[in-house]
Amino acid sequence: IQSAAVITLALNVVAMLKQEVRRPDLTDHARARPTFGTAWQDFITLPQARRLLWALGLGTMGFTMQDILLEPYGAEVLGLSVSDTTLLTAMFAGGMVVALILTSRHLGKGSDTIRVASTGILIGIAAFAAVIMSAPLQAPALFQIGAALIGLGNGLFAVGMLTAAMEFGGDKMAGLTLGAWGAVQAAAAGVAMFSGGAIRDLVTGWADAGLLGVALQSPASGYGAVYHIEIALLFVALAAMGRLVRRPGEVGENG
């Protein structure tokens, strides 16, 4: 733990050395600046701005509701040891790293950012299906593969949507667009993590009380309900992103 803290401190110091220098022409207090309300109104009236934020929020919730549930699911439903459940975090992070590498290569070749994000959603849907099926099959390996694929899909979606936001508003609205992206992503993630835990506890209580029938009187029922909701959210996000995809010959939404 101490080694990780030292490495984190060192990386932050290195990052500070490469920060962009302040530009006096842009930070001059005499420079005319629109109010936040005016700037926000200009942004939100852009074509597809609301759709972009809705797709981001729904997709983020779809990937994040499981955030606090994967490890207890592995232990309670599949009987994994502490070391095995801890390994899930590494597998999830490994999927994210692979996603960053793949995204860098594809976007560097001019791939559409929304298509990249959509690919991440499709991978996420398959990943949650694998996690769900690992319970009745009692297949820890399938569960671990699903966890890694969740990381991969989440990484592709997050980077794809972030890059789309950077391109969306053009140079004049880049800062506001990224701020909106961050606010929606953080709010959706917070709501998703709370909702995931609450829904799991609620459905598990119903299952234990026999309200869902004998077939669902299992510890997996609460987790499964959350994973099915996540799949539904990802499908809705995918549908919302359809009209954001660039058509052949288009440079960008506002390019």
Predicted regions and their residues:
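A membrane-interface helix-boundary motif in multi-pass transporters
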Residues: 1-6, 201-232
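C-terminal membrane-cytosol helix-exit motif in multi-pass small-molecule transporters
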Residues: 6-25, 238-245
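Juxtamembrane intracellular "pre-TM" segments in multi-pass secondary transporters
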Residues: 20-53, 255
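Short amphipathic helix-loop junctions that connect adjacent transmembrane helices
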Residues: 68-85
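Loop-to-transmembrane helix entry/capping segments in MFS-fold secondary transporters
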Residues: 82-83, 169-184
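Helix-to-loop junctions at the C-terminal end of transmembrane segments
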Residues: 98-115
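C-terminal ends and interior cores of transmembrane alpha-helices
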Residues: 122-138
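Intracellular juxtamembrane helix-capping segments at the cytosolic ends
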Residues: 156-170
